[in-house]
Amino acid sequence: MARVVNSRLRVGRLTQAGQAITLTQTDGTTCGPTCLLAARLLLAPAERWALTGELTWEEAASSEPGREGKHLMSLLSRQQLRIQRAMNVRGLGALPWPRALGSTPWSVARQMTEIVSTCTPGGGRRRYTVRWVGDHGPAWGREVVSIRKALAGGLPVVLVTGGPLVLDTDTVAETGSGSVGPRLRTALARTPAVSRHYVLALPWRTIGQDDPGRGHAYLYEPSSGSVRALDLTARRDPHRPGPRELGGWPRVLAVITPCSAVQSESWPTTSVSMRLINRQSCLLGNTVSAGCECWEACEGLAFRS
């Protein structure tokens, strides 16, 4: 039902034109739920999973000729929003999370744990956790090795990407045009990185591909539906636009990766959670470039169990 065709994640039957669609996020806040949906469809291809309480895959396939793809598109869009609502009820520990701010990495981790436990052999022994990372230096190299080890074992990994408030594109509007001036743009391009997007690293055997090579991973990018290999260890300017495989963002700020179920997951305390919400609420009105997940990485915040 879901497979990679021509570097796109396609969902549906491929026997006739108009039956399959490229799985993409339905709006600017659903990159997280779309990654989760992609993981579920790829890990359980034979499962007769009712995507909603109203419509199953079999019912979608019985649509009028030429309308099957449109039917699937509507079905998957509704499912993304359902996943998001379920995640955000307890987005930060016991606290709810507003839809306008996307989804938190901890709720994504919980959902990934559930998906893997039900869709992969021995998945119940794995629990997904959030780990904030620095995407450069020897420590990042070791992190990439860990990511690739999970992928080689058939387990997907979610990457949290982002960048500064404004990306330095070297395209500055003329003075007096009402746009951000060159000095302000340069200053904003040097601000701390903000988490903006989720992408899904895919096990290569799951998508019928060979190992992409040392340091590389196949990444599903939900805004375009593309699946391409990227060298995660390649140097990237943290102030400029990043590769399309990372959604155009230059930084990897966190990884949501499987570990032994006996390991505990760190959750933000209530005071830190409220600081996170308050700080991000202030940022929303100042975000110049479009983003998906609009919560802040806050790499310096302390987390505890």
Indicate where each model-derived feature is located.
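Active-site nucleophile-adjacent alpha helix/oxyanion-hole segment immediately C-terminal to the catalytic cysteine
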Residues: 1-91
